[in-house]
Amino acid sequence: MITIKKGLDLPIAGGPEQVIHDGPAIKHVATLGEEYIGMRPTMRIKVGDKVAKGQVIFEDKKNPGVKYTALASGTVTEINRGAKRVLQSVVIEIEGNDAVAFDKFDASQLDSLSAEQVRNNLIESGMWTALRTRPFSKVPAVDASPAGIFVTAIDTNPHAANPALVIAGHKDDFANGLKVLAKLTEGKVYLCKAPGADIPAANAEVHEFGGVHPAGLPGTHIHFILPASVTRTVWHVGYQDVIAIGQLFTTGELNNNRVIAIAGPKAVKPRLVRTLLGASIETLTTGEVAEGKVRKVSGSVLHGRTATGPHAYLGRYHLQVSLLEEDTEKEFIGWILPGSNKFSITRAFLGHLSPRRLFNMTTSTGGSDRAMVPIGNYERVMPLDILPTMLLRDLVSGDVDGAVALGALELDEEDLALCTFVCPGKYDYGSYLRGCLDTVEREG
């Protein structure tokens, strides 16, 4: 077992009850284009078209052969575009149960499938997009093969669902998904889970991770087991996508059901709910939000995105909806007050005297932008074998060569989310990292 000691379990109120409930009926779902890094769509549908679940709605001209399919059957009601005609979202109003039928196999046949059969079924169904690469965190090319595949069956994000609870009702599907994934690599499938979690491990090498966040991030697992580099590409996939892959191959139908957490300080009743990929967050949170100004976030409070306008839908890789108070008020001489109701990793406030207390955190950054101050905060929350202060300095200054030499290629934005949270200078290091990775990929 690998125990993560450097990191932070965010003491934020509003954790969900670990019991799965049925969510509200969803009337609209959306595929969000900007979630797929570097993707440039070739549209196969237009507003007003009727689509079946699993039907191709666009393909990626930058990554030929990668297909994106409809999350539900119904009518395309919106195709939203932003600056420079970047695809923001394709919205479908759900109607009927029409679905494309894909190849299906008996569970006993999965071990004898060829890599080509597996690859084709994943591509045609759109489930290929569940896979992501390191470096760069992109959907892999359809003819690529990884050095290994990491299955993330642990989640240490604040307010996350317990993966073992979700998998418990789908153990056969999960095991079948692992068998299928093993066909895509000549290396190993690495199943990463919490210590003692009852999770099937068919055809996979098991690694247990304990300790504080980011013990549950794929970047942490990859770093300690099979580090990614310019010459070594690995893939990772979430546990609920593994379940969906297993169901795809045994039923021939695309399963877009997901279990997510609706939680946060402004959640009326934080809990786990069953819903659909791409579900309307407005519908999901009806009756779930406390009074006042609230920011709805798709994903974790550490690395989610504001869900408004054309982006007001559950993200493809998100398993949480976080509800936070929209705090726009400035606190007079707040820096000098005792702060018994505030959290600080540097013990700047009296709140540290209650180590088990949960705080009603808001969207406030606690001050304006300022210079990057290296006072040891980054080292406290970075468990990877890198020099965080030096790396972050190079990212901010635009020194791409220096950042790559210090390990930037191993990372994704979520791996630097804690550094952003504890930064006195209020820097969003994830955006700097993405700029660095884009430069490396563009210039080779």
Swiss-Prot record:
This is Na(+)-translocating NADH-quinone reductase subunit A. GO terms for molecular function: oxidoreductase activity, acting on NAD(P)H, quinone or similar compound as acceptor. It catalyses: a ubiquinone + n Na(+)(in) + NADH + H(+) = a ubiquinol + n Na(+)(out) + NAD(+). The keyword Ion transport applies. The keyword Translocase applies. Composed of six subunits; NqrA, NqrB, NqrC, NqrD, NqrE and NqrF. It holds the Pfam family NQRA_SLBB. NQR complex catalyzes the reduction of ubiquinone-1 to ubiquinol by two successive reactions, coupled with the transport of Na(+) ions from the cytoplasm to the periplasm. NqrA to NqrE are probably involved in the second step, the conversion of ubisemiquinone to ubiquinol. The lineage of its organism: Bacteria, Pseudomonadati, Pseudomonadota, Gammaproteobacteria, Alteromonadales. PANTHER family: NA(+)-TRANSLOCATING NADH-QUINONE REDUCTASE SUBUNIT A (PTHR37839:SF1). Its EC number is 7.2.1.1. It is an enzyme of class 7 (translocase). Belongs to the NqrA family. InterPro entries: NqrA, NQRA_2nd, NqrA_C_domain, NQRA_N. GO terms for biological process: sodium ion transport. Keywords: Ion transport, NAD, Sodium, Sodium transport, Translocase, Transport, Ubiquinone. It comes from the Bacteria.
